[in-house]
Structure formats: structure tokens, C-alpha cells
């Protein structure tokens, strides 16, 4: 009888945690899904929706360099290379940036300068 009284709350807690995990996905997975959706929107030509999506990713995770790169890309392709350049310049001082992200950053900055007809930089 005593073991049944202990077993019922344990099972209840187990069900609660399993149910809670299904409803609340991990933040990292959610951001990855949002990033994938943003790329899909970008490819589909839905630039405004992609912009909002990458902006919300940055609001949740300000260390997401890839989202900043895509945000700048959308701005540059939309005719706002100055704002794109500001975003990309702000990433230069980041310490936790991979080599791939550095290459992408410099490529995007070069495209920004090209768009601005500023080849001296």
C-alpha cells in the first residue's frame, strides 16, 4: 500500500515532465527551426518575412552570427547597403566567431562596399 502511494506521484511527475518537454521544445532546436524557416523564406522570395524571422532569432540569441549575416544580406539586397554594412561591421569585434563565419562576414562586407561603389576598403 505504501509503495502504491509513492508510485502514483512518481508516475504523475514523469507524465508531467514528458508532456512538458513535448510542449516546450528546447530553445536551441527552436532557433535552428526558425533559421531554417528564414532560409526557406529567403529562397522563396519572401524577404520581409525572412527579415522579421532573422530579427526575432537575434532577439532570442544575440550571439547567432549567421542570423546577423542573413539580416545584413536581406538589407543589402533590398537596397540598404549602408545599414547592412553597419550590421556586418558590428560583428568584426566578436570573439566567438568561427573561421567560416569570418569568411562569410568579409565576403558580405565586400559585397556591401561593392554595392556602395566604395572599392577603397
Regions found by a protein language model. Name each.
Residues 101, 117-121:
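Cytosol/nucleoplasm-facing, intrinsically disordered, low-complexity tails
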Residues 29-63, 77-80, 86, 90-93, ...:
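Alpha-helical segment of the N-proximal tetratricopeptide repeat
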Residues 26, 60, 97-99:
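Short coil/turn linker motifs that delimit alpha-helical repeat modules in TPR/alpha-solenoid proteins
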Residues 14-15, 69, 87:
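Helix-centric, low-specificity signal for extended rod-like, repetitive segments
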Amino acid at each position: 500500500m505504501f509503495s502504491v502511494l509513492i508510485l502514483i506521484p512518481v508516475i504523475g511527475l514523469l507524465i508531467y515532465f514528458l508532456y512538458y518537454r513535448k510542449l516546450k521544445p528546447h530553445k536551441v532546436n527552436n532557433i535552428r527551426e526558425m533559421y531554417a524557416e528564414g532560409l526557406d523564406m529567403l529562397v522563396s522570395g519572401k524577404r520581409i518575412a525572412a527579415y522579421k524571422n532573422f530579427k526575432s532569432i537575434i532577439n532570442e540569441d544575440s550571439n547567432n552570427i549567421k542570423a546577423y549575416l542573413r539580416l545584413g544580406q536581406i538589407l543589402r539586397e533590398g537596397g540598404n547597403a549602408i545599414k547592412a554594412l553597419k550590421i556586418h561591421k558590428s560583428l568584426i569585434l566578436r570573439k566567438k566567431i568561427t573561421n567560416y563565419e569570418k569568411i562569410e562576414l568579409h565576403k558580405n562586407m565586400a559585397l556591401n562596399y561593392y554595392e556602395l561603389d566604395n572599392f577603397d576598403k
